Amino acid sequence: MIVLPNKVRIFINDRMKKDIYLGISNFGFENDIDEILGIAHLLEHLLISFDSTIFLANASTSRSYMSFWCKSINSATESDAIRTLVSWFFSNGKLKDNFSLSSIRFHIKELENEYYFRNEVFHCMDILTFLSGGDLYNGGRIDMIDNLNIVRDMLVNRMQRISGSNIVIFVKRLGPGTLDFFNQTFGSLPACPEIIPSSIPVSTNGKIVMTPSPFYTVMVKINPTLDNILGILYLYETYHLIDYETIGNQLYLTVSFIDETEYESFLRGEAILQISQCQRINMNYSDDYMMNIYLNFPWLSHDLYDYITRINDDSKSILISLTNEIYTSIINRDIIVIYPNFSKAMCNTRDTQQHPIVVLDATNDGLIKKPYRSIPLMKRLTSNEIFIRYGDASLMDMITLSLSKQDISLKRNAEGIRVKHSFSADDIQAIMESDSFLKYSRSKPAAMYQYIFLSFFASGNSIDDILTNRDSTLEFSKKTKSKILFGRNARYDVTTKSSFVCGIVRGKLLDKTSLVEMMWDLKKKGLIYSMEFTNLLSKNTFYLFTFTIYTDEVYDYLNTNKLFPAKCLVISTKGDVENFSSLKKDVVIRV
């Protein structure tokens, strides 16, 4: 670890795929409480800008921090990626503090599309922020556009809170002149912020939250000590369904169950977690997980690898102490209990977006203060990989699981999805068959539409056949290479339970790079949040799908795009009754 005079921390991580990865602690949307919810997320969207033909890049805003990364591709170099990321924050050697109203307006439209996307695919339920005075979704809404001047002032104010002590930088390599460049830019920031934000309200403990969830989850408040953090690292590397959450200076260990009986037994204090010592902790975490640790606990004074001896040599005492603290919090009701509930009729009037949630007090009724049984946990395997064809009945359940677990990766091709995970076959089956997970998987049907229309365009099956078997999506006919013929009509309107644009496009020069560039252009115009592409077996032919509330504008953009003169697009309007009648004509597509 390299520490600059103003306390910026720099780490060299040669295993990282990114060229540069930067995080800012105490800079997430928990700072929006008592201001305008969404300022942090809007700032993230305003800052990031790059040439998608020579860079891969992204940014994210969480409850307590913001992070940005950039990777060079094609003709760009690692140094180019570093300078590009730094340019998001500095202009002519000075920290950016000026944002045009037109740019703010476009990005607010983009935020509304992101809200729509996330609300269609996920359940946006940030329980901790909600209990602390925020909303269940805090990423910003379209009504921010009514206060553009106030929003701009808040953005400038937020930039002035950045300080050296909040900055963490990972670089793949520290090339010649890179350290000097960091000194001249991030090293020029004050060690402490120019504007000190007000303290974040303390979240309420002792609550039961009934809301959509794939698991029965308990958030247990523990002290944010070094030993407890090492204990969390130990548990995270060893077991599934264990993680942590922070808000302000508070730390919660999250434990999820698939069995309601074990969950209730844990809550009553009659059972403890069965934590066994493994052979050795290697700290082989992803760069995302490592960055999260440094940002959530900015007081850590050493490289995490400096603690590898301590976490292995003292694991027994660390885990005993953590287990005792967990049990004490259960008995004292220093917990937040998340109980899966999928009723569409319930909502909390404090949530301005009217998401389904009910909050109750966690009482001491039925507490047993002498545990007499232990609950086994799901152990992690080193690695596992499966391939699921689009016709497999478990496809949507696996997609749902990957969306609810960050350590599961999906890679999609024309025939199916490749899934990398670290579960055993028995544990995967137990999750897939659990009542709460099945209800959760079925509670957001919008994600299914992406695969319904992919099946329609990539196979010879009729829309009627596909809809009849939508729970399993249909097997794609991939034994022979499909020849796709485009008809005269480029637009087909349908009614579904969601609003989106999808279809197939073909062009002689069409490739993934040009489509990614197109996606970023649509994002800058505020018309979409993201777009998915699948390369079909027919030459220069892609299937694309995007959720959007601006369907006509997106269609007009795609219809006039010279990249793909051949196109067949489906525009879905959201309605209570599905109507696919426009797709029942043979002129749509022939395979």
Swiss-Prot record:
InterPro entries xrefs: Metalloenz_LuxS/M16, Peptidase_M44
Active site: E44
Entry keywords, A to Z: Hydrolase, Late protein, Metal-binding, Metalloprotease, Protease, Virion, Zinc
Annotated SUPFAM superfamilies: LuxS/MPP-like metallohydrolase
Statement: the UniProt record of this protein carries the keyword RNA-binding: no
UniProt function note: Probably involved in maturation of some viral proteins by processing them preferentially at Ala-Gly-|-Ser/Thr/Lys motifs. Does not seem to be responsible for the cleavage of major core proteins.
Family statement drawn from the similarity comment of this UniProt entry: Belongs to the peptidase M44 family.
Protein name: Metalloendopeptidase OPG085
Name of the coding gene: OPG085
